[in-house]
Regions:
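Bacterial N-terminal signal peptides that target proteins for export
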Residues: 1-9
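Divalent metal-binding pocket/active-site signature
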Residues: 151-154, 165-249
Length: 398
């Protein structure tokens, strides 16, 4: 959902650690900390190049714009890991645009690697489902890499292999604007779903053993991805039209088709209600992607401005109760074997009552109160993602 931040100007136009190891979780029992928890879409790498900011330092929602860090992940088992996103905003479909996007995406990939490498006793990179289990057994947090928007590949699908070599295991073809591969849910149709290059992209994703992410794809693109992929799809951060009718959300019929094909929808906190993108919000939010060029004092000032605006004028017209209603609906439609979590932390996600990852145990408690077992919760919090990742690995070479 990083287009909210990256397109602040666009929105305005529309409107006129320490060295100790993380303790291993106690498995079994009756708390959120009892099982492995993963999020399919973490935009936190946007913070990794910030001056004076460290992923290993504890922060709070009130005093920093980041919605997770290593200490908050480890506390009470809030979050054991997830897919750290290489996000690239959509640009022109030209050689120059592709080149700039490629360079940006490779740099962001390097920033993720460098950040995780600073804390080898606390978190590790994963390239497979087995890696995740190994890191879990060693009491470490887990970092996968993913691509949001395959625009940086340009017209050279061999670059997908390069990103795979660098550890990317999940990728989506498109983001906020229709590109060379697929139609965006929030842009005009062009390809009847996927372009010929997009169909080749699907085949290459399958050959490499990478999971296809259908979030941000139009309904027509979703249909083609589902029809063409030889392995199950994931929607890393999507919602349901039953709660809020928005192009980024999926209707019940498609959720059922996704489940029937073995895929999963990772329920999100965005587009559960209307987006309140006022001129003031667009101006402030548009600066978030510039944090890497800001001094620590400028970052602190932006945090104060953002949190004051959040209190006075929330960005989303939804709250924790809205979220739970949507989540319970998706579980009912898809089944516990086909639901996962992708809140869109640090990419525009977060709502009243669910502001950062420290609220994760509330979700587990409410699902338990709704009658879901610990086995159900284990599937939804990580098991389904790892199953789909393993299926993609098993299908590689085909």
């Amino acid at each position: 959902m990083r287009q909210i931040a990256a397109r602040g100007a666009w929105a305005l136009g529309l409107l006129a650690l320490s060295s100790c190891a993380t303790p291993a979780k106690r498995r079994g029992g009756d708390t959120h900390a009892a099982f492995l928890t993963l999020d399919a879409h973490l935009d936190t790498p946007v913070h990794f190049a910030r001056t004076g900011w460290s992923f290993g330092d504890r922060r709070t929602y009130a005093n920093d714009l980041a919605q997770l860090d290593i200490p908050r992940m480890a506390d009470s088992g809030n979050l054991d890991g997830g897919f750290f996103v290489i996000f690239t905003d959509q640009g022109p479909l030209t050689a120059e645009g592709y080149s700039a996007a490629r360079d940006f995406a490779l740099k962001r990939s390097d920033e993720i690697d460098a950040t995780i490498a600073r804390f080898p006793e606390r978190i590790g990179m994963a390239r497979s489902a087995a890696d995740a289990r190994r890191l879990e057994a060693g009491g470490k947090l887990i970092a996968f890499k993913s691509i949001e928007n395959s625009y940086p590949l340009g017209e050279d699908l061999s670059l997908l292999g390069e990103f795979h070599r660098r550890g990317v295991r999940l990728a989506g073809p498109v983001h906020g604007g229709t590109n060379q591969f697929a139609e965006s849910a929030t842009d005009k149709p062009r390809w009847n779903g996927l372009s010929p290059s997009g169909e080749r992209w699907v085949a290459e994703m399958n050959r490499l053993g990478m999971v296809i992410d259908a979030s941000h794809a139009s309904d027509a693109a979703f249909d083609r991805l589902l029809a063409l992929s030889k392995t199950p799809l994931v929607l890393s951060h999507s919602g349901t039209k039953a709660v809020f009718d928005h192009p980024r959300n999926l209707d019940d019929a498609r959720i059922r088709k996704l489940a029937a094909a073995g895929g999963a929808i990772c329920f999100t906190t965005i587009y559960l209600g209307a987006l309140n993108m006022t001129p003031e919000r667009a101006e402030v939010f548009g600066k978030h992607d510039q944090m890497g060029q800001m001094s620590s004092a400028e970052q602190a000032d932006l945090t104060v401005r953002t949190r004051a605006l959040d209190a006075r004028q929330p960005m989303w017209s939804a709250d924790f109760e809205t979220y739970m209603a949507g989540l319970l609906h998706v579980i009912k439609v898809a089944g516990v074997d086909h639901v996962c979590f992708g809140a869109d932390w640090d990419g525009g996600g977060g709502i009243a009552g669910l502001e950062d990852i420290e609220a994760h145990p509330k979700i587990t408690a409410r699902l338990r109160a709704a009658g879901y077992s610990w086995a159900d919760l284990q599937k939804m919090w990580s098991g389904n993602l790892l199953r789909i990742l393993q299926a993609a690995e098993n299908g590689s070479g085909n």
